[in-house]
Regions:
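A short mid-domain helix/strand-loop element embedded in enzyme catalytic domains
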Residues: 1-52, 65-72
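A detector for short metal-coordination/catalytic motifs
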Residues: 39, 45, 49, 57, ...
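Ligand/cofactor pocket segment of small-molecule handling proteins
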Residues: 60
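Conserved active-site aspartate in kinases
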Residues: 76
């Protein structure tokens, strides 16, 4: 009987301790609400030079002609994360785009054929095509050097259906 009582006391204390810890954690997270914390961030080395070269070459979004440098994105055709060191800095692996078109391209909703004609994913419905100013007659200027990257994008990133 005394053994049972000891076990019950241990269990009771354990349960109380658990409740106190949860309460402590809740209090701590409430105190953190709206606060900031430091984070380690990976930075793409030479991305600024890559962007600068694309801005100097194209001067505007290759699809919609937005030309405010502050709004333009240096978009890798073959994604940066899987490009080798040379491909990451190769200007032929880049297109200059506004943020909306860059996001569509990065997510595979648009791509291009070897002549630069736009390919539009069936997943991009008519309303979003209209809102994003995407039409099947769009065409970008591409060079022979762009084609290997465009082919990669079309095969590995583009969502056809």
């Amino acid at each position: 009987e005394e053994e049972d009582r000891k076990v019950e006391t241990i269990i009771e204390n354990y349960e109380k301790d658990k409740i106190n810890k949860v309460t402590e954690i809740e209090k701590y997270t409430e105190e953190l609400e709206g606060k900031e914390k430091e984070a380690v961030v990976k930075v793409r080395i030479n991305q600024d030079k890559f962007r600068e070269k694309l801005i100097n070459k194209y001067k505007k979004c290759c699809l919609c002609n937005v030309n405010m440098n502050e709004l333009l994105v240096a978009s890798h055709i073959k994604p940066w994360s899987i490009s080798d060191a040379n491909e990451k800095l190769d200007i032929h692996n880049g297109l200059l785009m506004c943020p909306n078109h860059d996001k569509l391209f990065d997510r595979g909703y648009i791509s291009f054929d070897d002549t630069g004609r736009i390919l539009i994913s069936e997943k991009l419905d008519d309303n979003n095509r209209m809102y994003m100013n995407i039409t099947p007659t769009m065409k970008i200027d591409i060079t022979e050097e762009n084609i290997k990257y465009i082919k990669y994008h079309r095969k590995n990133v583009f969502i056809e259906k």
